[in-house]
Swiss-Prot record:
NCBIfam families for the chain: PRK00881.1, purH
Record's keyword terms, sorted: Hydrolase, Multifunctional enzyme, Purine biosynthesis, Transferase
Protein name: Bifunctional purine biosynthesis protein PurH
Organism: Trichlorobacter lovleyi (strain ATCC BAA-1151 / DSM 17278 / SZ)
EC number per UniProt: 2.1.2.3, 3.5.4.10
One of the record's GO cellular component terms: cytosol
Gene3D superfamilies: 3.40.140.20, Methylglyoxal synthase-like domain
Gene Ontology terms for molecular function: IMP cyclohydrolase activity; phosphoribosylaminoimidazolecarboxamide formyltransferase activity
Annotated PANTHER family: BIFUNCTIONAL PURINE BIOSYNTHESIS PROTEIN ATIC (PTHR11692:SF0), BIFUNCTIONAL PURINE BIOSYNTHESIS PROTEIN PURH (PTHR11692)
Reactions the enzyme catalyzes: (6R)-10-formyltetrahydrofolate + 5-amino-1-(5-phospho-beta-D-ribosyl)imidazole-4-carboxamide = 5-formamido-1-(5-phospho-D-ribosyl)imidazole-4-carboxamide + (6S)-5,6,7,8-tetrahydrofolate; IMP + H2O = 5-formamido-1-(5-phospho-D-ribosyl)imidazole-4-carboxamide
Length: 519
């Protein structure tokens, strides 16, 4: 290991850079820098040599050319143990650079702004930064490269232990991180620009890059014979399972993560009142609204208490002690919510295996992004199903108008139905599911299962269907069970027949003109 004697520092994110530079100066490291970074370091009392002085060539083209010079890249790429390299460097007056500290122009943050123009995006594509990073990473045996402020402290600790040097093992790890970082950076640029090919700026790009980082290894996958790991996307701010914090409990399983995702996404549908959902195998087995988390949970569990055993529970409100006591009175795999009060957390400790997950507060976050479905050899890419039509905005197709109470129930049922596997049929009142039929190959069978599962009275409830009724038999079955109103997308060639069935039974029927298939 050779002692670091010269470092080139040029960063957009200046977190921790002054402290790092002062520590390097303490080891006698010469600091090269550019632009705003050099200005900041000088203002902090450090001696800095401009890169233009080091290369003998000025910055030009509005700062587009600063470090793209043989004296920079020769100093990074020259192999210290290669005599020919060293001779050529000496011949051309190239001095070695032992450390590079660089992070890149904030392209992703720039294009995330609603008023970002193509020119704005182009000007935030870093050229010199990735080039230096890649040069340093290629010659990682001789050069330490830092692209993440989170690594500054560890490198300084190693330098302290090794007389100002960094090990080859650490340099290799940091180099790998560089290539992961530049791949993600280029992928973001490619995705954003690629979506703007042609006249339609909303086209999907010809090539699509997704960069994810491993959050944790999992014991196994969906089944014990499958290996698995959990990866998360970069820069996620929306409250979701991927940025949830585990406060206690056993290690998350593959199936836990999928069900936690289903739970938190379901309760996001409800903002006006406390909501609770109980999930089994990604399907809701009970959803309810209440005046408090505990009242919502008790009503959700009432729908199907047998299936609720061993389930995963999601809330849209902070969980209090009363809810925690009830949750710990039975066996549950996990709970996910936007927070817990101190007493609730203390109660959960009595059930140390229960996984308690916290997401950021649900209000005020924009829901965006793609939905990816894996097929063998490929990916299907689509926008997430974030659409929702309120029952009051639906078109009434029946002779009878729905009552205000029915409209409230239809709205609740439609929001729940969106999160049930197709074919999906849901019976509800205004704030509680009564029967849920999920995942059947025929819609009428889903209706029959919803009736069979119902422990609460179906008479006077409403029905939601995630897609149109292909025949009137589903409506007839619902009427026989006591349903008074139906919400569905419409769009069948037999819509008139289905509407006529509703009229014959005196039911109200509204069309959403929006389908919510879920596979």
């Amino acid at each position: 290991m050779a002692k670091i004697t010269r470092a080139l520092i040029s960063v957009s994110d200046k977190t921790g850079i002054v402290e790092l530079s002062k520590a390097l100066a303490g080891y006698g490291v010469e600091i090269l820098s550019t632009g705003g970074t050099a200005k900041l370091l000088r203002e902090s009392g450090l001696t800095v040599k401009d890169v233009s002085e080091f290369t003998g060539f000025p910055e030009m083209l509005d700062g587009r050319v600063k470090t793209l010079h043989p004296k920079v890249h020769g100093g990074l790429l020259g192999i210290r143990a290669n005599a020919e390299h060293q001779a050529k460097m000496k011949e051309h007056g190239i001095e070695p650079i032992d450390m590079v500290v660089v992070n890149l122009y904030p392209f992703e943050a720039t294009v995330a702004k609603p008023d970002c123009t193509l020119e704005d995006a182009i000007e935030n594509i870093d050229i010199g930064g990735p080039t230096m990073l890649r040069s340093a990473a290629k010659n990682n045996h001789d050069v330490t490269v830092l692209v993440d402020a989170a690594d500054y402290a560890a490198v300084l600790e190693e330098m302290a232990a090794n007389g100002g040097a960094v090990s080859a093992k650490t340099n290799f790890r940091l180099a790998v991180k560089v290539y992961q970082h530049t791949a993600a950076y280029d992928g973001a640029i490619s995705n954003w620009l690629g979506a703007r090919l042609g006249e339609n700026t909303d086209e999907y790009p010809e090539t699509f890059t997704i960069q994810v980082k491993k959050a944790q290894d999992l014991r196994y996958g969906e089944n014990p014979h499958q290996s698995a790991a959990f990866y998360v996307e970069r820069g996620i701010t929306e409250p979701c399972v991927s940025n949830a914090v585990q406060l206690q409990g056993k290690e998350l399983s593959f199936n836990n993560i999928i069900d936690l995702d289903a739970a938190i996404e379901t309760v996001k549908e409800f903002t006006d009142k406390p909501a609770a959902v109980i999930i089994k195998h990604t399907n809701p087995c009970g959803v309810a609204l209440g005046d408090s988390p505990i009242s919502a949970y008790l009503k959700a569990r009432e729908c199907d208490p047998v299936s609720a055993f061993g389930g995963i529970v999601g809330f849209n409100r902070i969980v209090d002690a009363a809810a925690a006591r009830e949750l710990t009175s039975t066996f549950l795999e996990a709970v996910i919510a936007p927070g817990y009060d101190e007493e609730a957390l203390a109660i959960f400790t009595a059930k140390k295996n229960v996984r308690v997950m916290q997401v950021p507060l649900l209000a005020g976050h924009l829901q965006t992004g793609y939905d990816l479905k894996r097929v063998v050899g490929g990916l299907l890419l689509q926008g997430r199903d974030l659409g929702m039509v309120a029952a009051t905005d639906c078109k009434v197709m029946s002779e009878r108008q729905p009552t205000a109470q029915e409209l409230a129930a239809l709205d609740f049922a439609w929001r729940v139905c969106k999160h049930v596997k197709s074919n999906a049929i849901v019976f509800t009142n205004a704030d509680q599911t009564v029967g849920i039929g999920a995942g059947q190959m025929s819609r009428v069978d889903s209706s029959k299962i919803a009736v069979q599962k119902a422990l609460l009275p179906i008479k006077g409830t409403v029905l939601a269907s995630d897609a149109f009724f292909p025949f009137r038999d589903g409506v007839d079955a619902a009427a026989e069970a006591g349903v008074t109103a139906i919400i569905q997308p419409g769009g069948s060639v037999r819509d008139e027949e289905v509407i006529q069935a509703a009229n014959e039974h005196g039911m109200a029927m509204v069309f959403t003109n929006m389908r919510h298939f879920r596979h």
